[in-house]
Structures are given as C-alpha cells and as structure tokens.
Amino acid sequence: MKVLFSWLKQYVDIDVSAQELETKLFDCGFEVEELIDLGAEISKVVVGVVTECVPQEGTHLHICKVDCGDYGHDIQISTGAPNVYAGMHTPAALDGSTLPGGIKIKAKPLMGIESNGMLCSGEELGLNEDLYPGAEVYGLLDLPKDTVPGTPIQQVVGLDDYIFDISITANRADCQSVLGIAREVAAVLNKPLKMPATDYTVSDYKDPRLSITVEAPDLCPRYLGHYVRNITTGESPRWMRRQLALCGLRSISNVVDITNYVMLEIGQPMHAFDMDTLESCQIIVRRAKDGEKITTLDSKEFTLTPQNLVICDGEKPVALAGVMGGLNSEIKPETTQLLFESAKFARDNIRKTARGLGQNTDASAHYEKGISEYTTELGMARALHLIQELGCGEVTATEFDCSAGAPRKGKHFTARISAINAILGITVPTEEILAILKKLSFEVTMEADGDTMQVVAPRYREDIEIGEPDLAEEVIREYGYDHITPTFLKAAQVTTGGLTADQHRRDKLKSAMCAQGFYEAMTLAFYADADLDALHIAPDAPERNVIRIVNPISSNLTIMRSLLAPSLLNVAVTNLKKGNAAGRLFELSNIYVPKQLPLTELPEERLHLGFVAFGEHEDFFAVKGALEDLAASFGVTFEVERAEDVPYLHPGIAAYILCNGVRVGSFGKLANDVQAGLDLPRDSRANQKIFLGEIDYETLVAQLPAGLRYHPLPEFDTVARDLALVADEETPCGTIIAEMKRACKQLADVELFDIYRSEAIGAGKKSMAFTLHFAPENKALEAADVDRFVKKILGNLKFKLGIEIR
C-alpha cells in the first residue's frame, strides 16, 4: 500500500526523517518494501527568474538572462519555448543538473549562442496537471511570482516528498489506509493523532421515495446510505488530485474522487449511485439470481450466481457488492443527486466473487482483508464532510442504517500482566504495558491486585481475538523485539540440523541428472487442454481427468497438470525458437490427480521426474545411457521394453522403463506427427530430434534398496566375449539381453556396441553385436568354460527367439 509522507504529516507531527520513520515502522511490524523519493531523479534544478528575454533573429530561440539566486544572478540560457517572457519564474536546469530519465544537462552552444543550462517545462520534470497546475501547458512551466530564485524546484512543485510502499499483513486490515498507518506512526513516535474532520450539517429535506432493504444480512452485516442532492460535478481541488495521483489513482470528478479519497484515507471503499438513473429508488441488497447479468463500470458483462451479492434498484442490479458499481448507475457530469453507500460485506464472499469472476479491484482487496463497522461509519461521515468542504452538494436528512444487529463494540478481555510477561519470556514493567496499550487506543482498567486488568480493544481492531496472546504481541512490537534475549527452551536438546532421507534422495537424483548434462527446469503447475491435444492424448485417457481452474490467470493456464511432458516440451520449443539448437532439461515436480470430480477433497499429488533432450545429434541410446547411469547411482538397474501405446512417442523408438520388473516410466523419440504440429523454427524442423520421458518418482523409490549392501572385491577377473547375432528387425534389444541373462547366471553384464543391416543379412533382419562379460564364482574361467556358457546362451536364444549367430 502506498502512503504519502506529507499525507501522514496531516495527522501526526512527525519530527523524524522519512528514512528514520521507515526503520521505526519496520521495528513495530510494518515492512516498507520501497521508500520512493519523488525528487530523487532531479538535481541542481532551481527556480529561475527571467530578467531579460531577447529573440534571436532568424531562429525561434530566445536568449535569456536568468537570476538563479545563490547559483548566479545573470546566467545566459537559450530556449525555444514560445511562452517565455521577461519576469517569468520558471524551473532552470543548470550546468551539471539531472532530470527524470537520467537526462544530464550541460552548458553548450545552441545555434552558436552560449547556453548555460535549460529552462524546463512541467513534462520535463515528470509532472502532470494532477501534480502541479500548468504542468501540461505547451512551453515552460510558469511558477508563481512569490517563488524565490535559487530555491530547489522540488520544494516548489511538491517533489520534496516520499512515498512509503508498505506491506500490510492479512491480519491488519485496520492499517490498509493512511489513517491506519498514521495511528501506528503516532504510537511509535509517542505523538497525538489528529483525526480527519468528519463534521457536516444536514438540511431538513427528506426524500420519501428512497428505501433500503438488506435481504442477505449474513453477507452484509451493515449498510449505510445517505442521499445528497444539488450535486455540482467538476474538477477536484489540486491537493486531492495530487494525493490520489501519487497513490496510483487518476482523478475523475470531485464526487468520484471523494469515494476514492475516503478509501485511501479511511480504508472504507465507498460507492456513489446516480439517483437520476435509479427507477424505483428502492435499494435492495440480495443474493444474485442464477444467470442474472450485470455490466460493471469497466464495461465488462458478468453472469452471476447466488454466491454473488448485488445491490439492486428494485429488481435491477446496479452494483456488484464490494467489487464494482454497475455501468447503469455511474456518476456522470450531468448527475444532480446521488446516494452514498458505505457498507461492511462478508470478506469470504467478496473474495470468492472477485476470484470467481476474475474482477479484482481496490475495493475488493480492502473488503477481502476485512472492514470494521467503525470504519464503515467513519468513511460515510468523512465523505459527507468532503462533499460540503468541496461545495459540491447538499447533505440531506435522508439517511439509512441497516444493521444485522446492534453496532459492535470493542472486544472486552480480562488479562493479566504476569500472563503477558510469561508469553513474552521477559518482564515488561506494568506501567510500560499500560502506556503502550493506551497509546494504541486500548481502554485499560487495572484491578486492585495490580496484575489483572480489564481491556477493551478499539472498534477498528477486529484482529484482536484471543486476549493475552494478542495483547502480548501489541506490547512487544512497541516495546521492542530487541528486548527479547534468545534462550533455549528449558527442555530443549541441541540437535544438528539435517535433511530427511527423501530430501537427500531428491538432491541425489537431481545431481545425477545434472551429471548427465541435464539442466533443472521449474515450470508452472498449469497448462491448457490444447497442450494435451498437441500430445495426442485421447479424450478418455487418464491424463484427461484434470482439475480445472475456476479463475485462470491466463487462457493458456486453465488446468492443473496431469503430466510433466507438455510443460517440458513447451520449454524445449521455446529454447529452439530462441536459437538454442540443443539441450537437456529435467524437472522434479508434482502432478495432480483428482480422486473424484467435482472435487470433494484435496487431489493426490504425485512426484514425477520429467526430462527432455533435443538436438540434431541426440539419439535413443544416448538418453537410455543417461537413464542407466541414473539407475546405477541408486544401486539398481533399469530394463526397457518396447512401448507402442504412448500416444506422443514414436512407436518404434519408445520404451517403458522397468526397475525390478516394475514399470516406473517411459521415454522415447517424439512422434513425427506430434513434432510436425510444433511451432519449431523452419531451419530446424527437418533434422531436429526431440526425446521425451517421464518417471513416477514414488513408484521408483519403492523399488530402491533400503540401504547399501557391500560385497568383497572379485577374486578372479571377468572374461569378455564378443558375439554377433542375427535377429528379426522387430526383436527388441532388451528382450535379447534378458534371455541371455536367464540362460547363464555367470553372465554379469551385456553391452550392445553395434547394429548392422544389409541385403546379405536378409530383409527384415538386423545384426546386433554384443560384448558379454562373464564373472567367475569360485575359480578362474578358462576358454572351455566360456565356450560352454556361450553355447548355452545361443541355444536359448535360438529356441526362444529364433536368433542365430552371424
């Protein structure tokens, strides 16, 4: 929330600098995310008085003598501004000065005439009409004649000010206003708070047409309405326009500006209905009817449900309660009468409405954090005061106060000094506790025992709920957290911090992937149906059982992911389009599987390892090798079997990944028709290879050994034998290796090192060359032993798979 330093000074006599106040606010629990110096970009720009102005013949320039006080009384500056004249007071940027945007001004000749600076327009100082009158005039900024030459321009045009951008925590709804922060400033500086004026006079006029009925008191506990007539719309005074502009709101008209001003100053969102557009003048606050429509002030049409609260003129909705007014009742230049609304709406309902409709506004942001009834009353009174202060209307006696019960009083607690100190773990003197609570506007009455006190919280502090713990927090943030001495709990034991076994496992997995040349990616947990369409996922596939987002942040992010593959493929395509011709990426993240739809409980979150490798030189076996090394790092081996039913993978270059015979994932080359549908750069479409894979992490972890097992080093060397086999083209390599190992238990490892095809081998056949590693058990292997093993293996391959030695 943005708060203007000069605005705070209207309520508190601040005797510290903005920087010191920033520190004090932080110490009492308010983080200033940014302290903006409005004049920081301007230096050495002062008030200059043009004492002499002579047109330069043949040009549009004027040669001026400028009095800049202590900076020089006769400085020559040339200008092409048409409105310059002798006696003019205007900003003068001197030699070596800087302007917004990093512009530096230096003395230099202008069309051959010496110019020792520049005379400035309002635009060149970053000003507009809301910040300073005349700032948008074409030409130089004409300053008042009482400005003193040499005065820094920041002091003249109001740029000697600061904006505090303060982070307001969700529990401190009372501080989402200038007044709320001013209360805290007054307390931390131990200064009195000067409340904004809320007095106003009421005429005798009562409008018999008006009535207000609240049909949903659970969603609207308090609704105040006040009729104002004889409205004169026009421009707001400069002080109001300036404060609105610096806090991020544009000036519209005096009446609309009052509602925005009260929201910033008091924290109460206000709304003004144009009474000239209301037909029945019967205001009804009710739940919307199913399918009912409303067009809001920003010309957006919404279809409503009974979960939404609307303000109606009879049957016709004229505002979306707590979010935005309707277009059919907006204040216009010809408005002559209005109804002010100041209300307290149920925060949860406003949050659901704003999120559900995707209509987040300043008003809804305030209501979502909570508005007290005190703020509702104060906001209405302040708005009516401003109507009279600005002279733009007659406050009538027609007013309404619809409440679900008696106005809420401040919460009452019985608290003990000893209990507060016990919570804090330190001893804060009783008189200090009393002083702190009183300057925070708590009513405190001590009982005779000197320990018990009766405390009444301010009406605007709805966050004070649980007595002594909340009061302890209030005390310590004012007393100072630095008074707390760090100590161990009495029963505490010193332990070394560490990661859990699963955290170690995840880190190990990531390190193993990085060792294979993969970079970790972190993608959003959302994508769109189109991303699943692009992978040719069937409409009835389990991956289509997805959770849909009610209020997506983008049309491309409408569902929660059921696979990592679409996200990683999008990242790969983006890299290729950016000129990265090759790369390897992985992600270890959750997918979301609903237990049933519509959701009645939280979905299952399963951790998956997704990976993608792309580039002209990538191939299936390189990726397979990376996976084998990954498995080896966990003390297991991966086996593969042909996969022909993964819709987005090439049926001949895809495999399921097995660990201990359990299928844990799949990988392979992206199917040609899927790749053809990608938005790839034209020069890389033909030769680009993309390999995509995904492993269910939790299924994999279930197959990992519980701990390390150690074996003695082998006493005898292994023996290697190369073998070339002729097999059918369709016979997978993994099947051949599995049959070899089943035939001979002494076969420790098998490596495929060549695949060869030719007419001599035969159509539909391929030659596969393997290196077989035999490990002896209790004696060194001789050639005869190895021959016997090979014969056994060949016999098994011929019988099971019809494979012959080449």
Label for each model-derived stretch:
Residues 189-214, 391-420:
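Terminal amphipathic helices with adjacent charged low-complexity linkers/tails
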Residues 2, 23, 439-442, 448, ...:
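A carboxyl-terminal module marker
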